[in-house]
Swiss-Prot record:
GO terms for molecular function: hormone activity. Keywords: Amidation, Amphibian defense peptide, Cleavage on pair of basic residues, Secreted, Signal, Sulfation. The modification Phenylalanine amide is found at F180. GO terms for biological process: defense response. One of its GO terms (cellular component) is extracellular region. Residues 152-188 are annotated as: Disordered. Residues 27-170, 184-188 form a propeptide. This is Preprocaerulein type-1.
Length: 188
């Protein structure tokens, strides 16, 4: 799943990365811009699908957790689950930072690159279109980061609130079921 998303991001980054272009390349560049726009939209759709596959809405994740851990004993450690989710979140954030850096680096560096890139161009390449696509990709990466963080459990405050509710008495496992199979303190 993550390999597919990362491959889509890598392909979009490589196809959108401006290279030095020979003169007379503007007509072909317009065609490439259309393809890059299509790839950006495909990437956005792929990230939405990926986030949905990771668990959907927070309420759906909670329902899935209740079903997933309903019959588990103490074989799943709460700290292990939190640690793995934290690791996945950090890995996704690092991958998206690398992708954003490959798209042009810091805003100052992008501005310097834009000045050099468009210094000798005629009016056949619209600078706003190119900057707009870069801005779109930046926003798409930011949205992907938010979607990924939400899919992994929401904000740190939300995860903490969920954990406090889920593990309030310390005697219950992930779903509120007692260790001996009793529910809500009732005997079988």
């Amino acid at each position: 799943m993550f390999k597919g998303i990362l491959l889509c991001v890598l392909f979009a980054v490589l196809s959108a990365n401006p290279l030095s272009q020979p003169e007379g390349f503007a007509d072909e560049e317009r065609d490439v811009r259309g393809l890059a726009s299509f790839l950006g939209k495909a990437l956005k759709a792929g990230l939405k699908i990926g986030a949905h596959l990771l668990g959907g809405a927070p309420q759906q994740r909670e329902a899935n957790d209740e079903r997933r851990f309903a019959d588990d004993d103490d074989d799943v450690n709460e700290r292990d689950v939190r640690g793995f989710a934290s690791f996945l979140g950090k890995a996704l954030k690092a991958a998206l930072k690398i992708g954003a850096n490959m798209l042009g680096g810091t805003p100052q560096q992008r501005e310097a690159n834009d000045e050099r890139r468009f210094a000798d161009d005629e009016d056949d390449v619209n600078e706003r279109d190119v900057r707009g696509f870069g801005s779109f990709l930046g926003k798409a990466l930011k949205a992907a980061l938010k979607i990924g963080a939400n899919a992994l459990g929401g904000s740190p405050q939300q995860r903490e609130a969920n954990d406090e509710r889920r593990f309030a008495d310390g005697q219950q496992d992930y779903t509120g079921w007692m260790d001996f199979g009793r529910r809500n303190g009732e005997d079988d």
